[in-house]
Amino acid sequence: MRIAVDAMGGDYAPEEIIKGALLAHRQLRVGIALVGRPDSLKPFLPQPLPAGITIVPAEEDVGMAEEPLMVRKKPKASINISMQQVRSNQADAVVAAGNTGAAMAAAYLNLGRLAGIDRPAIGALLPTLKGKPVLLLDVGANVDCRPRFLEQFARMGSLYCQCVLGIEKPRVGLLNIGEEPNKGNDLALATHQRLAQLPGIHFAGNAEGRDVLTGEFDVVVCDGFVGNALLKFAESVGQVITQVLREELPRGWRGKLGCWLLRPNLKQVKRRMDYVEYGGALLLGVNGICVITHGSSKAPMVYHAIRLAKEAAEQKILQRLQAEMVDPREPESNPRRRTRPLQVYSGSGPEVLPLGSLERTSSRCPEPVEDAQP
């Protein structure tokens, strides 16, 4: 198992990215390909390199503030080289921190979409009261959606829960403002009708915002605009509760004693609510395993992102998606079975990324400048 890691992406790159990658290498026993400028990476790496760690050179990187389409203007950027590691079968998955739009664009340009998928979706795992995660998608890849897109999100999410989380019959919910089938806007109404008639998934009806973290649903689908707002709100909940406990519990000698007695329990509460434990979000619908994590990721979150990528690769989620995502209701001649351009939103509005438009000098990735020591 080998994971390609864009070591130049994120606010704390490359130091924190490398720390997390080295931790994953030691604890998960997985090979790591660190992609970036060698002169920037080497100061943070042990010498000689541990067995299983390689450096793959990249001349450029795409910054957090740059437009997603910079991946097309920078064909030798680390995010592109990382995706090409997967495309050429030199890596089983890729982990990228930093510019989410750039990571999505690079994945599409280098890996392409799966047949039967109109729009890839970003799926994030969130903690629930029942101790099992819920998969929320889309959380930012598509701010405007059609009912057909949400139907595909539901199918991909259900397959992920079956393959990776081991849930035999995942309960799929549609995020809405009410439980009744006649609630919601035009998108919600049309999507509800499609999901209710969709074979192969267990559609459990509408999910209100208060239902997402209860554990009643295994998959919750929505458009990327709503999903991204909900994701960031959910991530803040744990931080707010932790901060309130830190401020209120130590007040007075009784509070200090209570803190000492409850310390193991409080640590467990923090662990259950900490989004860092879930590592990142999977980009489902592209022809490769890609995990996108926060631009503010430090070593622990990078470690968990690599763990998430490893689990997805081991459970062969990509092969299941490749085999089952083509809609049997659509004839072979339907253009939706073939790859079409993808819109990526930038500061100047939506722009089209045609597959294959990225300049490539070779069909293979650069060879590592330093191989692992035997």
Swiss-Prot record:
This is Phosphate acyltransferase. Pathway: Lipid metabolism; phospholipid metabolism. One of its GO terms (molecular function) is phosphate:acyl-[acyl carrier protein] acyltransferase activity. It comes from the Bacteria. Homodimer. Probably interacts with PlsY. Residues 323-374 are annotated as: Disordered. PANTHER family: FATTY ACID/PHOSPHOLIPID SYNTHESIS PROTEIN PLSX, PHOSPHATE ACYLTRANSFERASE. Residues 326-335 have a biased composition (Basic and acidic residues). It catalyses: a fatty acyl-[ACP] + phosphate = an acyl phosphate + holo-[ACP]. Pfam families: FA_synthesis. It is found in: Cytoplasm. It comes from Synechococcus sp. (strain JA-2-3B'a(2-13)). HAMAP family: PlsX. One of its GO terms (cellular component) is cytoplasm. One of its GO terms (biological process) is phospholipid biosynthetic process. Its EC number is 2.3.1.274. Catalyzes the reversible formation of acyl-phosphate (acyl-PO(4)) from acyl-[acyl-carrier-protein] (acyl-ACP). This enzyme utilizes acyl-ACP as fatty acyl donor, but not acyl-CoA. Keywords: Cytoplasm, Lipid biosynthesis, Lipid metabolism, Phospholipid biosynthesis, Phospholipid metabolism, Transferase. InterPro entries: FA_synthesis, Phospholipid_synth_PlsX-like. The keyword Cytoplasm applies.
